[in-house]
Amino acid sequence: VKNNNLNYVKIPREIIYDKDLSSKRVIIFSYLCARRSLDDTVAFSTTELCHWSKLKPNYRNGKINQKYYEVLLLLSHYGYFESCPDFEKCLKENTNSVKYQQVQLNIEKFDVPDSFGIIYFDELDKILNFKEELKGKDIDLARMSSAYILLLLSYIRVNLNRIEDKPLCCYRYFKTISEDIGLSERYIGRIVDILEEF
């Protein structure tokens, strides 16, 4: 988000639909946008990224720190960074998760002119804190993740019907959404219930 004047992040359609990037793709992209400095760099540690996304850091094999590194590695392969650390090396060496690293963003990939889903910062904050926001509500939050909620919300936003003189809507079957973004139909239904509360 250039100049920090904008109060939203734009999630490109190609990120939303790329199931190879894992379900963590939108939350990591949102983090990079939210933490973007004026010179288009982001300094971060995976521990900070975990804390920001309200998760406990865990750098063991297959756990959250490694999952985040895997997404960062794929983003680097896809050209989202002009320069970045060797994420493959970080994965193999279980790099200290509190060590700060820096990426130089490829602004052509981040400043997308069209085909994106907008997530407003106030929505992002509510979603990151969804367990607190929904405390006392009769909603199943077991094994739910803010990464899943952000992924579905960005999908809905990129697919909104923008026909003049018609209400904004996104008409999709849960099965189609599941095929498009890789979340199960059951999770999609639960996330829709959560989004309705916001």
Task: Label each PLM-derived region with a short phrase.
Residues 1-23, 37-41, 90-143:
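Positively charged, structured surface patches that bind polyanionic biopolymers
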Residues 4, 25-27, 64, 96, ...:
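A general marker of short, structured functional hotspots
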Residues 7, 28-30, 67, 77-79, ...:
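Intrinsically disordered, low-complexity N-terminal regions enriched in serine/proline/glycine
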Residues 10, 19, 31-33, 46, ...:
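Intrinsically disordered, low-complexity regions enriched in small/polar residues
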Residues 18-41, 47-50, 139-165:
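Detector for short helical micro-motifs
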Residues 34-95, 158-198:
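Winged helix-turn-helix DNA-binding recognition segment
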